[in-house]
């Protein structure tokens, strides 16, 4: 056994984080150096190829590879099968698709009164093509592999050791930090080029304000749905789209994207308190029973 393989087996999450940040940031580099980025290269290099490759190869493929090295082929196959695990009740799919838009609508009514309902009624026909279809496409192409890294690999390992709430809090700044290079790329974090003066605000937003409630809620959905990656991916993309320009302008005019994350923060606090920090994770006795039934419980970090 090589020393590298031994190191990965001893510390799989550290090994994966090195692969994740090193690989993803290298793939972000061409667009970052091009005219849509900081402009060191004379050509405009689109960001999409690097982003898609980072998601598919590093976040998805890399997490499977490290699982295979650390835990063996059977564990890697079980890990990969989570990408097609659909065994959750219909109420969870309704929550994943419509929960965040409805939460923001409630917040809009509280802020603006009953008039906030009018844009929704007037533009309801825009929902299938402007929200539902791109939601499913993006969840399948991007968010399943993305959450294979954050939920299925990192959170799932850490929550067995330090608990789901602490695991979510640990993953949150890492999730935000990975996105930092996108700040300097046109269209990376916003539709246009962000001024450097906005960097401190976006850094706080990425590292704390947006990511902490999002990771808490995603962990809750993950644990409550028998670790269904497709469902978690849909919920993740629903958050991104609801806070995006189309949904805000069409259904919530006058509501700033920060209010979306404020509403999510309230929801995350309610979930954390209601579940006593377990976020849907079975008790240790229940987890032991699952292990006896043949479900692997991985605790290596």
Say what each PLM segment does.
Residues 149, 153-158, 184-199:
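Membrane-interface interhelical connector segments
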Residues 193-262:
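Functionally important transmembrane alpha-helices
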Residues 2-143, 171, 184, 206, ...:
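Specific transmembrane helices
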């Amino acid at each position: 056994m090589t020393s590298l393989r031994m190191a990965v087996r001893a510390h799989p999450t550290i090994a994966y984080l090195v692969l994740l940040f090193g690989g993803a940031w290298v793939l972000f580099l061409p667009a970052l150096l091009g005219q849509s980025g900081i402009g060191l290269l004379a050509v405009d290099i689109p960001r999409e190829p690097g982003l898609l490759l980072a998601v598919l190869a590093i976040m998805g493929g890399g997490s499977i590879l490290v699982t295979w090295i650390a835990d063996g082929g059977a564990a890697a196959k079980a890990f990969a099968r989570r990408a097609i695990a659909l065994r959750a009740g219909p109420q969870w799919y309704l929550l994943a698709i419509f929960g965040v838009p409805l939460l923001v609508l409630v917040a809009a009514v509280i802020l603006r009164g009953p008039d906030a309902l009018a844009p929704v009624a007037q533009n309801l026909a825009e929902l299938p093509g402007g929200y539902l279809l791109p939601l499913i496409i993006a969840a399948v192409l991007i968010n399943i592999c993305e959450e294979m890294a954050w939920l299925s690999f990192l959170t799932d390992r850490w929550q067995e050791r330090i608990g789901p709430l602490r695991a979510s809090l640990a993953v949150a700044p890492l999730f935000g930090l990975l996105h930092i290079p996108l700040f300097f790329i046109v269209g990376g974090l916003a539709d246009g080029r962000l001024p450097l003066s906005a960097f401190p605000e976006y850094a706080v937003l990425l590292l704390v304000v947006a990511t902490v409630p999002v990771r808490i809620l995603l962990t809750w959905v993950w644990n409550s749905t028998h670790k269904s990656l497709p469902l978690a991916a849909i919920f993740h993309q629903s958050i991104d789209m609801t806070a995006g320009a189309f949904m805000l302008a069409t259904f919530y005019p006058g509501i700033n994207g920060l209010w979306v994350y404020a509403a999510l923060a309230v929801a995350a606090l309610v979930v954390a308190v209601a579940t006593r920090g377990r976020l849907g994770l079975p008790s240790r006795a229940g987890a032991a029973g699952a292990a006896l039934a043949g479900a692997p419980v991985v605790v290596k970090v």
